[in-house]
Structure formats: structure tokens, C-alpha cells
Swiss-Prot record:
Keyword Mitochondrion attached: no
InterPro entries in alphabetical order: Transcrp_activ_Zfx/Zfy-dom (IPR006794), Znf_C2H2_sf (IPR036236), Znf_C2H2_type (IPR013087)
Highest taxon, organism lineage: Eukaryota
PANTHER family tied to this protein: CHROMATIN-LINKED ADAPTOR FOR MSL PROTEINS, ISOFORM B, ZINC FINGER PROTEIN
Keywords linked to the UniProt accession: Activator, DNA-binding, Metal-binding, Nucleus, Phosphoprotein, Repeat, Transcription, Transcription regulation, Zinc, Zinc-finger
Any one Gene Ontology BP term: regulation of transcription by RNA polymerase II
Domain writeup: The binding of ZFY to DNA is mediated by the interaction of the GGCC core base pairs with zinc fingers 12 and 13.
Zinc fingers classed as C2H2-type: ranges: 421-443, 452-474, 484-506, 515-538, 544-566, 572-595, 601-623, 629-652, 658-680, 686-709, 715-737, 743-766, 772-795
Compartment(s): Nucleus
Family: Belongs to the krueppel C2H2-type zinc-finger protein family. ZFX/ZFY subfamily.
Protein name in UniProt: Zinc finger Y-chromosomal protein
Amino acid sequence: MDEDEFELQPQEPNSCFDGIGTDATHMDGDQIVVEVQETVFVSDVVDSDITVHNFVPDDPDSVVIQDVIENVVIEDVQCSDILEEADVSENVIIPEQMLSSDVTEEVSLAHCTVPDDVLASDITSASMSMPEHVLTSESVHVSDVGHVEHIVHGSVVEAEIVTDPLTADVVSEEVLVADCASEAVIDANGIPVDQQDDDKGNCEDYLMISLDDDGKMEHDCSSGMTMDAESEIDPCKVDGTCPEVIKVYIFKADPGEDDLGGTVDIVESEPENDHGVELLDQNNSIRMPREKMVYMTVNDSQQEDEDLNVAEIADEVYMEVIVGEEDAAVAAAAATTVHEQEMDDSEIKTFMPIAWAAAYGNNSDGIENRSGTASALLHIDESAGLGRLTKHKPKKRRRPDSRQYQTAIIIGPDGHPLTVYPCMICGKKFKSRGFLKRHMKNHPEHLTKKKYRCTDCDYTTNKKISLHNHLESHKLTSKSEKAIECDDCGKHFSHAGALFTHKMVHKEKGASKMHKCKFCEYETAEQGLLNRHLLAVHSKNFPHICVECGKGFRHPSELKKHMRIHTGEKPYQCQYCEYRSADSSNLKTHVKTKHSKEMSFKCDICLLTFSDTKEVQQHALIHQESKTHQCVHCDHKSSNSSDLKRHIISVHTKDYPHKCDMCDKGFHRPSELKKHVAAHKGKKMHQCRHCDFKIADPFVLSRHILSVHTKDLPFRCKRCKKGFRQQNELKKHMKTHSGRKVYQCEYCEYSTTDASGFKRHVISIHTKDYPHRCEYCKKGFRRPSEKNQHITRHHKEVGLP
């Protein structure tokens, strides 16, 4: 016989108590004291042969109780004078795992103290009465009881059980009575719970399970539990059908709930309950999940952190039952936790409430998971009719698609199942998929949302170059795959938008429109040449016009330098060689590039080179004397306050007042915007398939389609619930709720809440001061960056440091 199992068989009413040790069992007057160690396994007499771990006793009429740990057979203590009716007048303390042997006569005990782990096998008395204040530990095993009257703190529970000796399994006394053909009603009210933490408040746990004649669960509206089942044949042994695995999660509920629990039917045809999972037994036969579900009431004073996106169902949830198996990751973590707890189970002994003992037995494994909620894996065998609840580890099964949203069935107080969507990261549950998606933004490290999306298909990526390569793949589509042909040139395209853009090229080629100047008789075929003519000739900003080419300039020095191109004059000569130049900046560039070895001393600030150290030191004094204004945000120094303000605006602010009309991108300065607009020219135009909008950047086209041709407003304000298409629009809207001061420009309609951005706007737009001068041509600029861009563009040989 296996050490982890024991078999109880009926015999004649002749019993022996075999204690551990010679002095463990004794009789003192009216008291009988029996002391047995924990984990006692029982064997019984079958005809004349008795086998207990290959041990045959001399007396075949005795019952041997053997300690498995020490493998010792203890002497027998036989009780002959036993009364038919037992009346207990004193307080009786029944410890864990009590199992009694056969009792054939009446026993009258004035005071009885029974230690842990006493096996109660056959009690044939007609009635047993116990007074109040009875403390019962986790698992008390009773079998073959004719009539039991159980009083627990004033709550009387009666159970009538048909006598069937030694056929009961090991179950919990408070919830399940083994191998019963009659009805057992148990009231769990008033059961004291051993609180380990004083600050957690009272916690009441109820487990409601009922079985009908066929071994199915039935709901009983009373506060007790009804069981009516027969256990004649174990179907698991006959046809090989094994029970399914049910995963139980216990949630929080208000302490004032009247409904202690029950069961609810789940019909497979209902669409909201379509969450069943086919279960495989040991013979790989498919077994459909049960049609009824158990729910439980758990009161807990602790409350989780408030989440605005969580569905308000925390006070309505009793127990969640997921029919099926865990995924591999969760099962592995659970197995590790159970193994670690089993290692320490021999050292830790705790008193558990009776209601918990029915679900978890003697072990506290799996009572709490990582999120703080109670959970367990229960193995329920309906076919035996005993309602046994034992630990069971499910098989690992690969999920078909990891991206599918897992759902759970929640049984509410009204008895109807609710479908919720749990977060796979923190365990919170939501009533809709939309709330779950919004909640997932709180876990940015787990988001897999791609940044760029193709406008022609569902392709997404986080890299811009990958999207460009993908767009090129659309161009290489075979002509046979629904290619559209151009009527003018016969060129094929993959979609109508590309064909429409291509036809615009034919229209531009066929047009011979001449652009005329409205101030003079100048005309040209290109609009860009006309714009250049207007700026050079008819603009007040370029009053100095070249008589040779008509180009205009702002300053006379610029016109003078330009005239040297037509005359060929080169007044600037190199002192190290015969090189001559029409511009001084070109000469400096020549000296730096060709004669850098002769001038090896360089300034650390402006990178100018000098022939000796004295020149470098004298030059450094210019930088030290000029910079007296220190930036409070960094080490930058400026020669005047206006330069310092420009530095703060351009470096330490995030406002971008200058917007591009094509892509709505913002810039600090107009020069940056002008450079950006020039980048749009000369690129291939992408036509919107819904309107006449076209743009060179495909990402701008995607943004246009989302903002103009879609009704979805994904970005919503948390205060007023107003929706916006883009995130920057939501940020602008949120400033209206902040109550901050709004700065309004007196020259235009510009307004902002940023003081530095407002100053930058006034300086860059409504100021004509040009404090930054070019060292080579003395041209003035508003900002140092504009001056550097000018040097790069017009003084190429000099370059920037």
C-alpha cells in the first residue's frame, strides 16, 4: 500500500487504539486519554489477513494504527466497556485530523481530551451531543456517524447520516461529510477566525458547495450548505474520465453583504458566457467544462489604490472562476511558490478557519497570490459524490495567440455572469476592452504600439527608414496585381492615389502659362523666378540693386562685394603665398586650410588661429571683457542682455511659434522655418485619396488623413472629456485648465502662457534690431544661429568652428 494513501474497510465492532509509545494511552477513572502523533495512516482487517506495510499481526481481530514516519507498530489498547450514548458535559477540544476507530458500545466521558491526528473510523452510536464553545481545527475526519448534532457558538447544525462503516474519505468536517446518502446542513455563521494581523479587521470567508443526486452543484438560498450524493462507483476508475481544473480567484466585497454565496448555471449557447475551454483528461479525451460555477463571499477592509479606468465592480464580485488552465509562465511561478511553501510546511503550523479548511485542507499553499487576493487550484471530482477538494497542478498548455485579450467570468450578487478584461501586468480587471487599452498606458514599458503606420496597408514600425523601405515595396508591386495604367504615358501604378499624382505631372508639362510681374513688364514661365524678381527689384527690403543682373541687396557693402564678381577685382592677397580673393572671408578660409601649420595657436572660443601665444592672449581678452551677462541655467555668457534673452529663448524654452503650413512643424526662429520650407521643394508629392491635399512627406499625409478624414478622437481631456485628434492639441487645451496667466501680443493675435516664449515671439517677429554682425561682410542678424547659417551659406571657404 502506498504511504500517501490509506484504505478503510468495514469490520466487526471490535476496536483497538494503538498509541505512539507505551505511556501514550492510559485510562484514569472516567477519563480516557489517547495521544497520537500527526499523520497517522490506518489499515483494517480483511478476513483473516492483515497487512500494514507488509506487517502481519498475531491477533487478526485488531486494528493496527501505524506511524509511517518511524515505521513502528504500537501496542494495542482495547476498550471493552463502551456505552451506547456519549454525553459530553465539559468543553471538548478536538484538534486537527481526528480519526476514530470502531466503537461498539456506549462510552460516558465526563471530560475527554483528544490530541492531534486521531483517526475516527466507525462510531455506531445513535446520537452525539456537544455543548457550546467547541473549537474545531482545520480538518476533522468523521465517518459512519448515525446522527450528529453540532453546536458552534450558538448555531445548531444537525446532520443525519446513514451508517456505512469505514467508507469515508478524508474531508473537512465543517463543509463536507464523507460518503453520505442523507442531507447535511451546515451554518458557517459565527465561526471565529484566527486573525494574525490586528489592523486588518474582521474577515469572514464562506465557501458554498452543494451537490444533487447526480453529483452536480445546486444553489441553496439558505445560509448553509446542502449535500446529497451517493458514492458507489468512482467513474474516474471505470471510464478513465478525470475531473477538470478550476482556477479560483477571491476578490473583495463589502462587509455588509447578506448573500453568502451560491452557484449559477452557465449555458454554452449564451454568447456572453462563451469562455469555456476544452479540457483533456489523462487519456487525452475531451471533457466539456462543468455547467455550474461556485461563488464565495470574502470581506476585507483593505482597499486597493484607486484607478479611474477600473470598472466599478469591486463591491459586486464574489469569486472569479476561469475554466481552463494557466499559461506556462503563471504555472511555472505557481509551481515554484508551492514547492517553496512545502519546504517550510513542516516547520509552520497555523490555525485556519473551518471554511478555509474545506478548500485548502491542511496546507496554506496558494491562499494568496502576488496581488494580495486569495487563490487556489482546486481539483473537484463530481463522479465520486464526495465533493472532495484537493490540490491539483494543471498541465501546461500553449496559448494559441498571446495577443488575444484574456477574459474572465465574474459572478455578481444577482447571480449573472459578467465578462471582464484583466490586465496581464498588475491584475486589475475592466468591464470593456477600451478601458483595458487606456489602462495599459500606465505600463509604458510593456506597450508594443508602433510609431509609424503605412497608409496603404496595416504595416507598422518604430523606425522611419523601415517605413520608407516598406513604401518602396508598394512601388515594386507587380503590374499584374491590379495595376492601374496611365492613359497618357502607359505607366502602371499600384493604387489610384499614385496615378492621380502622376497625372498632375502631365498637366504641368502641358501648361505654358507665363507669370507676369504686376509692377513691370517682366514675365517668366516659373513662379520661383518671378518671386526672386519681386524681392530683388520691387521689395523695400532690397533697395540696392545691381545694374548688371538686377539682384537686390539690403546694404551697400553687400552690393559692393557683389560687383566684384562682374569686374573681376580681387583686392585681398595672402601674406604666405600669391593667393588673391575678392572677399576677405575667402582669404581667411584659405589661410586656415593651407597655412594652418604656420599658425598653430588657436583660440578655444572662436577657433581663430594665430602665429604666436601673445596674439592668442590678446585675442582672449576680447571674449572675457565682452561677456558679462551669465545665464542662470547654464554656463553661457553674453555681451549684452538682449543676447542673453535670445539664448534663454532658443535653448531653455520649448515653445515653437513658427509653424510650417505644409506639415505643421514648429520652429524657434523664422530662419529655421524658411530652411525647413525649402526642404519641401523638389520632393515627390503624395496625393490624399480623399481630397486635393498633397505633400512631399508621407508621414504628414498620414497625419492629415487621421486628423481630417477620421472621426476618432483618441486624446481626451480628463477634466472636461473633450476629444482631440492630436496630442499637441490636447496639451494646448490643458493649459486652459491650469489657470496660468496668458500673454497676448499687442501687435498680432499670438498668445501663450509661457513668458519666455512670448518674449521670443516679440523679439523674433516684431523687432528690427540686428545686433549680431558678420565678421566678414558686417551683415546684421537677430540671432547668432542666423549669423552662423549666413556664414555657412555665403562664406563657404571660411566655414563654422
